[in-house]
Amino acid sequence: MSGPAAKGWCPSLFAPMRAADGWLVRVKPPGGALSVACAKCVAGAAERFGNGTIELTSRANLQVRGLADEGIGPFAAAIVGAGLADPDPEREARRRVIHPPLAGADPAAARDAGRLAAEIEAALAGDPGLADLPAKFTVAVDGGGGLTLGGTGADVVVAWVDGRWLAAPAGADGGAEVADAEAVVRLARAFLEVSGRCAARPRRMRALVGAIGSAALFAAAELDRVAEMEPRAKPQAIGWLAYGDGRRGAFGLGLPFGTMSAATLAGIAAIAVEWGDGSLRLTPWRAMALPGVEAAEAPALAAKAARLGLIADPSDPRRAVTACIGRAGCAAAAVDARADAAMLLRRGLKIAVHVSGCSKGCGQVEAAPVTLVGEDGRYGIVRDGRAGDAPSVRGLTMAEAIGLLEAGP
């Protein structure tokens, strides 16, 4: 592998990003799942070649921090050797699918959800004509069941609706029927073609649909809109997730601030062996789902997870506050986001807050009720928006921001 080139946005396994704590790389497990052996491989490689910190991203990828220059190549080799990445860097970069978390486990989900997601990912990866897709362009395959993929911010959503698969570009109110991966590839190609003709080229599908309308995009893709598609809500991804007759299910474990140590990942793998089916399913909500858990064993699993510092209770107050890594790991950050987020937790605010180190908003895809945006060592407040939106108030210390939030709207 040639020497790394610094990136400022969306790292991958073969295109690391320089951060304040070393190089940052992403691992995209095939099918969105880790076997116990693969989890141990990632944990071991993160400890050996990085600083042992692993994050779970909003696209259900793993992000490993703190790699030294000399560790980038060996880390990538370990991940490829474990079957967790395509050895071709260009194909790996085009693997852009958020997989249905409980495919093959939840009987209420579409039976072919995992197969279709894999086919779509292979088709995107195998099409060199899609090399110019923006780094954040993502497809979500939602097979229904207990863990739907609502609120992922994906550019194309492929969903199981009333007994058939529909594909909808973000911002559209309807979808085209999907028989195989071809419809999704057509939408991706149409995005490139149509956005390339715009004076100010949109970087996301929602912006393009907002500019030209979904009918024009479907026409460019040579697809027919056949049915309405209602956006699905973000599911409850933490705690006991029953399926079938309720005697078995999955258990969702959240990561505080989406971060864990290599030792914690190994601990989750041990839990999956002891109580589940041995697989760790990644979700886009900074949580992992462990399928194959007996309902009677769920309390023991939750207790073990709590001892590891994981979020096992849907009412855990740590779920309400999210934060990017901030100055501790990002040179672009203007504030120590996670330390300040911990201060918010101690105050027990009854509102969901995202703390962003800067206006890029890497740590939060969707809008939040409140976003605190770092600016020159202080904070701006964005309500019902994203970090890149204009703050209604600027120049606040964290204490001042907390005071305003405690005072109410």
Go through the PLM ranges and name each one:
Residues 2-3, 19-168, 172-182, 186, ...:
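Small-residue-enriched alpha-helical segments and adjacent helix-cap loops
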Residues 3-18:
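Intrinsic, low-complexity N-terminal interaction/targeting segments
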Residues 12-16, 238-243, 311-312:
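Short beta-strand/turn micro-motifs at beta-sheet edges
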Residues 128-129, 389-409:
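Short flanking/linker segments adjacent to small metal-binding domains or redox-active Cys/His motifs
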Residues 158-235, 382, 389-393, 408-409:
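An acidic, glycine-/histidine-flanked metal-binding catalytic module
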Residues 230-250:
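Active-site cores of enzymes that catalyze phosphoryl transfer or operate on phosphate-rich substrates
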Residues 347, 377-389:
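Short microdomains enriched in Cys/His and/or Lys/Arg
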